[in-house]
């Protein structure tokens, strides 16, 4: 680069050093209890994906985490229900730290943990790992969405199930990432409802890949993966909802035609709820009816839930989402009871 004709970093205002993953892993090492829970839960979810377990996987929790205190209170309440319905449901808490934005907005606890535009990402990564460690130590397995190739090195060892979102399912690097993740992964259909891109993603992620990332020491590296056989589709709706009996049957047929497991998950939120959080219960009721009628290709559901229903722009109400609106705790209890009863009937001899 010359002073007369600069060509590099022209639009970059600042570059800050990021602490390497090993710094956080050293200060917040995974415990034997947490490792055992993650190991067991991953295997249980894999069994669900491959039809070896007849429980229903329930990924449930806040749209995003912005207050770790509220997240822990939510987890304590959810843990009671996890134990209560352990024969019918495999409950895993939704713990999302990064939010893909359609345009702009708060991008999550990791990106801006103080909610003030300071973008203290080093602190955000530490907060994320600390929360995940606490959750696993208390017996609550965690799930999250993976958005890039670097942050998984900071906390993926504490994740039991991962999601690739509707905006990134078609992305080559996210398919490559999924091929190397140690946990089962769900791929959402596209925002327009396109299911083929999710089916293609599962096929791609099941194969080995080479991609660029970083080591635990923070050095640039070429990662060679072995492929992930434990991936599945998430029906999240598109231009219209896609959770009905007909949609589930069609999706299962397409998966079988592609040589994949027909087991799939239904997202009760997003386009399936027509972006109205109250309609998540309607979706759950429809899924419950399908389960009672013997539908065995639905292996899981995803629900956006918090202590207080609705949403807010600023964190003024404790336990309420600042991103997508969520159902409240009372509705959460009703929904889990409904799903547990339905699955109990599905597997009854």
Q: At which residue positions do the language-model features occur?
A:
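Internal helix-turn-beta structural module
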Residues: 304-345
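Conserved phosphate/anionic-ligand binding catalytic regions in large, soluble enzymes, centered on
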Residues: 57-70, 324
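Short helix-capping segments at alpha-helix termini
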Residues: 83-87, 257-259, 293-296
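Conserved, mostly hydrophobic/aromatic
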Residues: 61, 266, 328
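Glycine-rich phosphate/diphosphate-binding loops that line cofactor/substrate pockets in enzymes
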Residues: 46-54, 256-260
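N- or domain-start disorder-to-order transition segments that initiate the globular core
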Residues: 9-49
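Active-site-facing alpha/beta catalytic cores
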Residues: 2-7, 88-243, 247-248, 270-271, ...
